[in-house]
Swiss-Prot record:
UniProt entry tagged with the keyword Transferase: yes
Protein name: Ubiquinone biosynthesis O-methyltransferase
Cited SUPFAM superfamilies: S-adenosyl-L-methionine-dependent methyltransferases
E.C. no: 2.1.1.222, 2.1.1.64
Family annotation (HAMAP family): UbiG (MF_00472)
Keyword S-adenosyl-L-methionine carried by entry: yes
An example Gene Ontology molecular-function term: polyprenyldihydroxybenzoate methyltransferase activity
Keywords assigned by UniProt, alphabetized: Methyltransferase, S-adenosyl-L-methionine, Transferase, Ubiquinone biosynthesis
Binding residues for S-adenosyl-L-methionine: 41, 72, 93, 136
Annotated GO biological process: methylation
Pathway involvement of the protein, from the record: Cofactor biosynthesis; ubiquinone biosynthesis
Family to which this protein belongs: Belongs to the methyltransferase superfamily. UbiG/COQ3 family.
Reactions that this protein is recorded to catalyse: a 3-demethylubiquinol + S-adenosyl-L-methionine = a ubiquinol + S-adenosyl-L-homocysteine + H(+); a 3-(all-trans-polyprenyl)benzene-1,2-diol + S-adenosyl-L-methionine = a 2-methoxy-6-(all-trans-polyprenyl)phenol + S-adenosyl-L-homocysteine + H(+)
Length: 253
């Protein structure tokens, strides 16, 4: 019997998020935490991309000429601001329902984005290449994190950047991100996150290194209930972001 082909897709996760697809653009709906989280993600991406590629972050379109992949893009909450910053954006998601919602919203907003109902491995097999890959709140939902990071890294141009945001596997994260957010406060539907699939920073950085990427920066992200805002922090016990670079041939000599 031939060996089953490895896949990054967890069918249960795809089904779970497909069922919530109509909620993506409701800032007070089931994805409210993601809407609140978006400003700190955007600032981290904008500042690091501008510094790396020598762009002015205050310019109207600082990402002009850059090709970005938002893998696991959901309804397009990151794709649209990336496009407005001037990037050529491909938004990919395993859920065709999510992609339909994202396409409709982009059309209504007058934003040009190339949305595809594709997996990371399918895009990599097509030979796609990008300057920047956004891998935000996705790795804790895939079936095979090593394969997922490997396929994403294949699509990154030398000198390109990959941003990863996820949740640490700690008791603190269990209490706040799962029990607190899903069962007590009900900010997220129950079952959105599974503790065993959360990813520690050392595990993520090991997967990035195995795929040939160099970790350049890491930061925690914490929620302040008094201001109802997320902020960067040294505390990586719950939410955190990592920035990695694919070295150029010259850098590897």
């Amino acid at each position: 019997m031939p060996e089953a082909r490895r896949t990054t897709i967890d069918a249960g996760e795809v089904e779970r998020f497909s069922a919530l697809a109509q909620e993506w653009w409701n800032p007070n709906g089931k994805f409210r935490p993601l809407h609140k989280f978006n400003p700190v993600r955007l600032a981290y991406i904008r500042d690091n991309v501008a510094a790396h590629f020598g762009r002015d972050p205050r310019a109207a379109k600082p990402f002009e000429g850059l090709r970005i992949l938002d893998i696991g893009c959901g309804g397009g909450l990151l794709c649209e601001p990336m496009a407005r910053l001037g990037a050529s954006v491909v938004g990919a998601d395993a859920s065709a329902t999510n992609i339909e919602v994202a396409r409709l919203h982009a059309l209504e907003s007058g934003v040009s984005i190339d949305y595809r109902a594709e997996t990371a491995e399918a895009l990599a097999d097509q030979g796609e290449k990008f300057d920047i890959i956004l891998n935000m709140e996705v790795v804790e939902h895939v079936a095979d994190i090593d394969l997922f990071i490997e396929k994403c890294a294949e699509m990154l141009k030398p000198g390109g950047l990959m941003f990863v945001a996820t949740i640490n596997r700690t008791l603190k994260a269990l209490g706040l991100a799962i029990i607190g957010a899903e069962y007590v406060l009900r900010w997220l539907p129950r079952g959105t996150h599974q503790y065993g699939k959360l990813v520690r920073p050392d595990e993520l950085e090991r997967a990035l290194a195995s795929a040939g990427l160099i970790t350049k920066d890491r930061t925690g992200v914490v929620y302040n209930p008094l201001t109802d805002r997320w902020n960067r922090s040294r505390d990586m016990d719950v939410n955190y972001m990592v920035l990695a670079e694919k070295p150029t041939a010259e850098a590897m000599i």
